[in-house]
């Protein structure tokens, strides 16, 4: 949370280490122990010799937490999405994707020969209209969404999307990079939505988990397909033992410390209440400024006050919606949350 930048000590409100597990003693010890036992790297693709026991254990743990039959670990979240989407879809298929879905989901669609259609953000009626008009023309349909949207912090209506996909014989895939560990009792966005059927649950090990890597939790058949067909699995070196060991330790903490997993959202909601903003749905809170220059200026003024808050500008976000993106963690002191809220009130016209 505390960083040095330009000789100044700042409190960061821009880091996705929501549970502050990157520096947790148990997580660091597990990474070191994994290196001592298995070495610094995996040495090869998982289909050759890179499938060390910690990866198998990690996949079993992820599947249990997500309530699926199996899981496949990838080298990163980006590698996961750019491997999963083209593996599941072909030229005779249809992909629907939320307009604000993460860039790596869009990258996955670009690697697939399937027809891709974009629906308005969280607009289930628009997605339904597309499926009603087009579904019959295609063999399979895949609907892609974030569980928690990384720039707006809002959640996808997963229960409604699940029912929609069931009605139109479509597969639903949710990217839970910003949900696991911080909502749904730590289990993520599907759990927070009441555990509707979401057959494809993807995520990352680099946010609340505090390490590095990506994963897909799904049926045993889908996971077998990924491990034998996904190019980002077959042609990538397996995740290093240290990353797998650290992730296992982090998941142990998440499963056994519910009070810790509840803190980031509580901090975000306290911030929103102080500023009169709508109640936060996740630890991510955007303060929309508008012009890129105004966002940069506000970020600089916050730094002068002792806070690191990154200005997010187009093309990362739509034109006219440049913003300060706040990410709240379990370790943020209540008084610092109150102070940064006051600083925003003084700097930004809300």
Curated annotation (Swiss-Prot):
Keywords: Acyltransferase, Biotin biosynthesis, Pyridoxal phosphate, Transferase. Pyridoxal 5'-phosphate binds at residues 77-78, 150, 175-178, 204-207. Pfam families: Aminotran_1_2. The modification N6-(pyridoxal phosphate)lysine is found at residue 207. It comes from the Bacteria. InterPro entries: Aminotrans_II_pyridoxalP_BS, Aminotransferase_I/II_large, AON_synthase_class-II, PyrdxlP-dep_Trfase, PyrdxlP-dep_Trfase_major, PyrdxlP-dep_Trfase_small. One of its GO terms (biological process) is biotin biosynthetic process. Pathway: Cofactor biosynthesis; biotin biosynthesis. Its cofactor is pyridoxal 5'-phosphate. Homodimer. Catalyzes the decarboxylative condensation of pimeloyl-[acyl-carrier protein] and L-alanine to produce 8-amino-7-oxononanoate (AON), [acyl-carrier protein], and carbon dioxide. This is 8-amino-7-oxononanoate synthase. It comes from Methylocella silvestris (strain DSM 15510 / CIP 108128 / LMG 27833 / NCIMB 13906 / BL2).
């Amino acid at each position: 949370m505390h960083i040095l930048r330009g000789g100044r000590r700042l409190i960061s409100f821009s880091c996705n280490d929501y549970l502050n597990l990157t520096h947790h003693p148990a997580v660091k010890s597990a990474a070191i122990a994994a290196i001592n036992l298995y070495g610094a790297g995996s040495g090869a693709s998982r289909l050759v010799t890179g499938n060390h026991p910690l990866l198998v254990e990690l996949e079993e743990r992820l599947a249990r937490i997500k309530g699926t039959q199996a899981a496949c670990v990838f080298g990163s979240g980006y590698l996961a999405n750019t491997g999963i989407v083209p593996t599941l879809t072909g030229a005779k298929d249809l992909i629907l994707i939320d307009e604000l879905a993460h860039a790596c989901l869009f990258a996955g669609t670009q690697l697939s020969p399937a027809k891709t259609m974009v629906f308005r953000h969280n607009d289930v009626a628009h997605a339904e209209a597309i499926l009603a008009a087009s579904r019959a023309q295609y063999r399979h349909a895949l609907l892609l969404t974030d569980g928690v949207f990384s720039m707006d912090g809002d959640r996808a209506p997963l229960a409604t999307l699940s029912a929609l996909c069931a009605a139109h014989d479509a597969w639903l895939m949710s990217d839970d990079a910003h949900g696991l560990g911080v909502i749904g009792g730590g289990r993520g966005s599907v759990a927070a939505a009441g555990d509707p059927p979401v057959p494809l649950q993807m995520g990352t090990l680099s946010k609340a988990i505090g390490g590095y890597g990506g994963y897909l939790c799904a049926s045993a058949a889908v996971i077998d397909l990924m491990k034998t067909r996904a190019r980002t699995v077959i042609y990538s070196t397996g995740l290093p033992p240290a990353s797998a060991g650290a992730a296992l330790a982090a998941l142990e903490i998440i499963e056994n410390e519910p009070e810790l997993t509840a803190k980031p959202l509580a901090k975000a909601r306290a911030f929103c209440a102080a500023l009169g903003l709508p109640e936060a749905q996740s630890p991510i809170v955007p303060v929309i400024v508008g012009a890129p220059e105004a966002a940069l200026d506000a970020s600089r003024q916050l730094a002068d006050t002792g806070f690191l808050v990154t200005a997010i500008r187009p093309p990362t976000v739509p034109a006219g919606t440049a913003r300060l993106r706040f990410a709240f963690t379990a370790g943020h002191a209540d008084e610092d949350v109150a102070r940064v809220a006051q600083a925003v009130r003084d700097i930004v016209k809300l």
